[in-house]
């Protein structure tokens, strides 16, 4: 956790409502950090429906492998998350640590290890000593409360500078249902299936298969559209749980993601996922500016997204933003290197509402002073129109500063 809060941090945090059927506890286990919580336990009083998406890294962490196996059952009784150690690339010791943690959690809750989900975040390659925290899980299960969401978000932080929380309440069959979410992430953010770590819970009675469909679709325009440094974590985990307790108030049980009664719920879930994803970007390591990259007029949506990510991941573009330099030529470079269809002589580029390039050259009305003044803001929008099709996409990133280098250069010290 950083000593200073990002200037892009939210000005206020939402009051996180209680979701019946789920309780949370945190503890300071001293896994890596001193004087702060680094362990989170989420307990479901009754089996919750479970869905998840995980990293596509070919070097996944032991907890990711464990979660994938358990997700087949579609039920959850507890989630255990530790920060400070990723338990990735740790071989047999890593697998033993996950098993020991799962067994301790199952004993504390009174369930099978197949109902336990695990996540770890932190340094890669260092064995995780489950003995530092497994003995705490029993007391945590007893003391867990329903109104501990922000504290849970704090416990899973690493280089984050603020906790990331989001909530929405929406009607399902005329009954209010709630969606709460927490996330962590500040570096190694270029998710292919999720983000670093994020956990979302609803009291809506939605079955696991439908929940999985909702989540898999929801990540496309949210967590799969953000990048801080183009590095995909070995530990990326996003899970969605449904306690179903709203059924006691008359909410209908949903078994199919295509159920029309889910229309408002889908939108609310999308807002929660987007809020969490953008909070991750705004807390990018060393970030001082948020950058939205919009690409229109591409051959396809997939092509537009690849071009947008080429721009968003370009160190030259990101450092230009950090230096408040209106160097639009770097955007041209990033479009050209993306490997997607583009026509130089149809290309147009905007910084905010200022068109800086048009039809293969600098815009005749270009003003260096006006564009430079725009670049001084905290929220920067780069728009590119290829004018060769109807594909469009939007991604989000942050600038690349000296602080990013310092944070990652000192990460293990």
UniProtKB/Swiss-Prot annotation:
Gene3D superfamilies: ArgJ beta chain, C-terminal domain, L-amino peptidase D-ALA esterase/amidase. It catalyses: N(2)-acetyl-L-ornithine + L-glutamate = N-acetyl-L-glutamate + L-ornithine; L-glutamate + acetyl-CoA = N-acetyl-L-glutamate + CoA + H(+). Its EC number is 2.3.1.35, 2.3.1.1. It is found in: Cytoplasm. The record marks 194-195 as: Cleavage. SUPFAM superfamilies: DmpA/ArgJ-like. The record marks 121-122 as: Involved in the stabilization of negative charge on the oxyanion by the formation of the oxyanion hole. GO terms for molecular function: glutamate N-acetyltransferase activity; L-glutamate N-acetyltransferase activity. It holds the Pfam family ArgJ. Keywords: Acyltransferase, Amino-acid biosynthesis, Arginine biosynthesis, Autocatalytic cleavage, Cytoplasm, Multifunctional enzyme, Transferase. One of its GO terms (cellular component) is cytoplasm. Its main location: cytoplasm. Substrate binds at residues 158, 184, 195, 285, 408, 413. GO terms for biological process: L-arginine biosynthetic process; ornithine biosynthetic process. Heterotetramer of two alpha and two beta chains. Catalyzes two activities which are involved in the cyclic version of arginine biosynthesis: the synthesis of N-acetylglutamate from glutamate and acetyl-CoA as the acetyl donor, and of ornithine by transacetylation between N(2)-acetylornithine and glutamate. HAMAP family: ArgJ (MF_01106). PANTHER family: ARGININE BIOSYNTHESIS BIFUNCTIONAL PROTEIN ARGJ, ARGININE BIOSYNTHESIS BIFUNCTIONAL PROTEIN ARGJ, MITOCHONDRIAL. This is Arginine biosynthesis bifunctional protein ArgJ. The lineage of its organism: Bacteria, Pseudomonadati, Pseudomonadota, Alphaproteobacteria, Hyphomicrobiales.
């Amino acid at each position: 956790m950083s000593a200073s809060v990002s200037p892009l941090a939210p000005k206020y945090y939402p009051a996180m409502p209680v979701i019946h059927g789920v309780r949370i506890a945190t503890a300071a286990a001293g896994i890596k950090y001193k004087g702060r919580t680094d362990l989170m336990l989420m307990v479901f009083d009754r089996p919750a429906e479970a869905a998840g998406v995980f990293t596509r890294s070919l070097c996944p962490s032991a907890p990711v492998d464990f979660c994938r196996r358990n997700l087949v059952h579609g039920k959850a009784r507890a989630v255990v998350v530790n920060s400070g150690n990723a338990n990735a690339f740790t071989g047999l010791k890593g697998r033993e640590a996950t098993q020991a943690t799962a067994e301790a959690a199952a004993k504390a809750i009174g369930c099978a290890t197949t109902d336990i989900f695990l996540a770890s975040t932190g340094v890669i390659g260092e064995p995780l000593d489950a003995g530092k925290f497994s003995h705490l899980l029993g007391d945590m299960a007893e003391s867990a409360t329903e109104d501990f969401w922000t504290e849970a978000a704090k416990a899973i932080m690493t280089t984050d500078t603020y906790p990331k929380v989001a909530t929405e309440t929406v009607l399902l069959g005329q009954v209010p249902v709630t969606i709460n979410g927490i996330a962590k992430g500040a570096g190694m953010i270029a998710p292919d299936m999720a983000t670093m770590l994020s956990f979302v819970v609803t009291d809506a009675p939605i079955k696991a298969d439908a929940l999985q469909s909702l989540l898999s679709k929801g990540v496309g325009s949210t967590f799969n559209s953000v990048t801080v440094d183009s590095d995909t974590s070995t530990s990326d985990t996003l899970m969605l749980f449904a306690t179903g307790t709203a059924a006691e108030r008359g909410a209908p049980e949903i078994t199919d993601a295509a159920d029309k009664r889910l229309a408002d719920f889908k939108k609310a879930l999308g807002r929660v996922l987007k809020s969490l994803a953008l909070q991750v970007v705004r807390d990018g390591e060393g970030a001082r500016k948020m950058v939205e990259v919009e690409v229109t007029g591409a051959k396809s949506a997939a092509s537009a997204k690849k071009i947008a990510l080429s721009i968003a991941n370009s160190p030259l573009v990101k450092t230009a933003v950090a230096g408040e330099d209106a160097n639009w030529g770097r955007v041209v470079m990033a479009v050209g290197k993306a490997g997607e269809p583009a026509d130089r002589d149809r290309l147009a580029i905007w910084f905010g509402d200022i068109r800086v390039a048009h039809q293969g050259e600098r815009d005749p009305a270009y003003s260096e002073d006006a564009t430079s003044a725009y670049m001084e803001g905290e929220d920067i929008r780069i728009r590119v129109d290829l004018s060769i099709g109807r594909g469009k996409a939007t991604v989000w990133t942050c600038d690349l500063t000296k602080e990013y280098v310092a944070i990652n250069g000192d990460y293990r010290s």
